[in-house]
Curated annotation (Swiss-Prot):
Name of the featured protein: Ribonuclease HII
UniProt-annotated location(s): Cytoplasm
S-S bridge residues: none
Main subcellular location: cytoplasm
Keyword terms, alphabetized: Cytoplasm, Endonuclease, Hydrolase, Manganese, Metal-binding, Nuclease
Domain RNase H type-2: 10-198
Length: 198
């Protein structure tokens, strides 16, 4: 992996998203400015960490970061805007929520939202840039907790297991029970289920 070269600036925020692919729930983003004086060991892409390790790092990031913030776009916004534009909006919200304004923002992936400060997209940034890794962890732990809470209300769909992704089980239950108000109506499988359910 090519080592990432940081921009010449002090306050760098990392931004990542979780939940572009699921059929249900919000897309959740996080923005994090780490404190160089309080390093956090073991930051890595949240998908490569065990749940136990993610939860421990989640608490450590919130405690040690100079600033952190969550952003989100709800299912109705995803349906109105499309998933790409809703993700960009959620990233803008996460950056706007930082109580310290970053001088530069590094975004995981290959697209940047419009921001009031310079920004750069970093491909595979969640495994190359600690700030993005930290954002990835905050976003994933937050969204996973939301899916676990939704699972209590709608146990028949198995949200706690598949986190809303279009698994065979989820698609089967969607066809059987129809969509909840938390499903993204613009996504093909949900559209089809609504057709079946009506």
């Amino acid at each position: 992996m090519i080592e990432f070269v940081y921009p010449h600036t002090q306050l760098v925020a990392g931004v990542d998203e979780v939940g572009r692919g699921p059929l249900v729930g919000a897309v959740v983003t996080a923005a994090v400015i780490l404190d160089p004086a309080r390093p956090i060991a073991g930051l890595n892409d949240s998908k490569k960490l065990s749940e136990k390790r993610r939860l421990a790092l989640y608490e450590e990031i919130k405690e040690k970061a100079l600033s952190w913030s969550l952003g989100r776009a709800e299912p109705h916004e995803i349906d109105e805007l499309n998933i790409l534009h809703a993700t960009m909006l959620a990233m803008q919200r996460a950056v706007a929520g930082l109580h310290i304004a970053p001088e530069y923002v590094l975004i995981d992936g290959n697209r940047c939202p419009k921001l009031p400060m310079p920004a750069m997209a970093v491909v595979k940034g969640d495994s190359r840039v600690p700030e993005i890794s930290a954002a990835s962890i905050l976003a994933k732990v937050t969204r996973d907790a939301e899916m676990a809470a939704l699972d209590i209300v709608f146990p028949q769909y198995g949200f706690a297991q598949h986190k809303g992704y279009p698994t065979a089980f989820h698609l089967e239950k969607l066809a059987e029970h129809g969509a909840t108000e938390h499903h993204r109506r613009s996504f093909g499988p949900v559209k089809r289920a609504l057709g079946l359910a009506s």
